Amino acid sequence: MSVASAVLRVETWLLATWHVKVPPMWLEACVNWIQEENNNATLSQAQINKQVLEQWLLTDLRDLEHPLLPDDILELPKGELNGFYALQINSLVDVSQPAYSQIQKLRGKNTTNDLVSAETQSTPKPWEVRPSRMLMLQLTDGVTHIQGMEYQSIPALHSGLPPGTKILVRGCILFRLGVLLLKPENVKVLGGEVDGLSEENAQEKVLARLIGELDPTVPVIPNNSIHNVPKVSGGLDAVLGPSDEELLASLDESEESAANNDVAMERSCFSTGTSSNTTPTNPSGFEPGCNISSRPKEKPPNQPTHFTDGEFDDFSLEEALLLEETVQKEQMETKASQPLTLKENTGKCMEIFSHKPSSLNHTALIHKQGNSNFDEKTSEQMIHEDKFFDCASTRNHHKRFSAHDFTNDSKISEVDDAAQQTLSSSNVHCLRNKILNRKLDLSEKSSQISKENGHPFQACSSRSFENNTYLSIGMDLHSPPFIYLSVLMARKPKEVTTVTVKAFIVTLTGNLSSSGGFWGVTAKVSDGTAYLDVDFIDEILTSMIGYSVPEMKQLRKDPLKYKTFLEGLQKCQRDLIDLCCLMTISYDPSSCKGVVLELQDVGMEHVENLKKRLNK
């Protein structure tokens, strides 16, 4: 008997006996495999039919990708389904009973109120209808996913059916909004199961997802409010900082508050980002005794990553350091976008232009004076498993931190005092008047720049852009002491250009990584007029951390010395949080990105240069 004739007979038998339709390619591969498994021995047609059916029952229909249901069944609000359809049960749950009580029974926990003597609810009367079971099934033909509801009690179904069980849906079936209303005469259980689904959609896991429990195989991320994080005083805990769970838990809160502030405040800068998720399509292939092709399982988020000494040539510090994600609501106030315009902004002006540096030389960070008291919660796994903090963060130079963040309430008052000592009020008023007297209609210009330079530059609101552009009239790209990103955006340089801007880190767009023996991290910076994606070079990060990548590898061999490396990471975290300085950036118009080559503290010479530029 030839393979082609055997395949044709099996296809006819499956359709006539079981109303099962399968792809011809899969059927041919299955018959060939059966013959190979039997050493090409002569098998009767009945034996081939039986083994093909067994293989189909163990196959995940999603891998076959052979549509059976009507294409528009999910689009119609209601209708009737007629005919025979062999479908697969991905999961099922009894929706007539609370999911919590069901999962407690599965776990063998006693939920009866034995200690409660009072009558908690009225006893049902004998004539009252008792609640009956109602199963909700997640069904698929391999392409279309639809729900099936136990409209009437179906004895053939029960909650113990393994995920991947095949059923035959037949007859005239009503459906409403993508839900089949199943009756006993509409369902016939064919059997089978799918190994992958048996673990993924086990009854306990399905119920746990319904009540909001996290998968025990995935690290738990507590939903801690930034106001309710307990304080830890002294010791190593205060040095290592908050755990990666806290950083990730607070990420959504800080992003939510930032989004609300962007909508509410007209002068605040805005930025948008998009992310795309791609799902690989598994090719149809045949594997004996199981699914046609194994479906790849997604790696749970925040899975701990362990590194060996030889794995640091190119690694991502998955749990790693960098910026604190427990920043409270962003304070994008008018003061930050309108320097030198109001009397109360005197201190802010001088915080920008006359901040006292720890060194007048080119340095890799800004050292700020004052009491910096921080109380942080520590992840114990960081010591034993060499894990790091996640590095995503948002940062504004005037943000306020909660109790367990880095708090330094004396900074503003200290800088205000320094500002008042440096510039007299008359000079401030003089500068303010000169700025306000330069009238230029910039709304059209700002909108044009925003459209033409949408990425990676992202323009601020028109009023913020207008106020910041008062200082940039007649400014070239090398005008001392610094220029604005909006000016660089407007000039549209054709070649790689090196400029100096006074900016701060808004957020890190990548993890701290080590590649080829060099540190690297990507970030989004802003000077209040626009945003720019940049890379920080190894020299800057090495200066902040205190150790190069080769030195870090040596420190890992000694637990005591490795502790100092972790302290260096924490120091780098604090420095990046407070980072607001002059940045020398090499901007490449072809890639629309920049490279931060140097960080420099603001000195008095920069203030004098700024005065000269304003007096022109």
Curated annotation (Swiss-Prot):
Compositionally biased intervals (Low complexity): 271-285
GO biological process entries: DNA replication; double-strand break repair via homologous recombination; glucose homeostasis; multicellular organism growth; reduction of food intake in response to dietary excess; resolution of DNA recombination intermediates; response to dietary excess; response to glucose
Entry superkingdom: Eukaryota
Region described as Disordered: 269-311
Localization terms from the record: Nucleus
MF term (GO), any: nucleotide binding
One annotated Gene Ontology cellular component of this protein: nucleus
Pfam families: RMI1_C, RMI1_N_C, RMI1_N_N
Record has ATP-binding as a keyword: no
Keyword set, alphabetical order: Acetylation, DNA replication, Isopeptide bond, Nucleus, Phosphoprotein, Ubl conjugation
Location of cross-link Glycyl lysine isopeptide (Lys-Gly) (interchain with G-Cter in SUMO2): 335, 387
Modified residues (N-acetylmethionine): 1
Similarity annotation: Belongs to the RMI1 family.
Function in brief: Essential component of the RMI complex, a complex that plays an important role in the processing of homologous recombination intermediates to limit DNA crossover formation in cells. Promotes TOP3A binding to double Holliday junctions (DHJ) and hence stimulates TOP3A-mediated dissolution. Required for BLM phosphorylation during mitosis. Within the BLM complex, required for BLM and TOP3A stability.
Subunit structure: Component of the RMI complex, containing at least TOP3A, RMI1 and RMI2. The RMI complex interacts with BLM. Directly interacts with RMI2 and TOP3A. May bind DHJ. Interacts (via N-terminal region) with BLM; the interaction is direct.
Stated name of the protein: RecQ-mediated genome instability protein 1
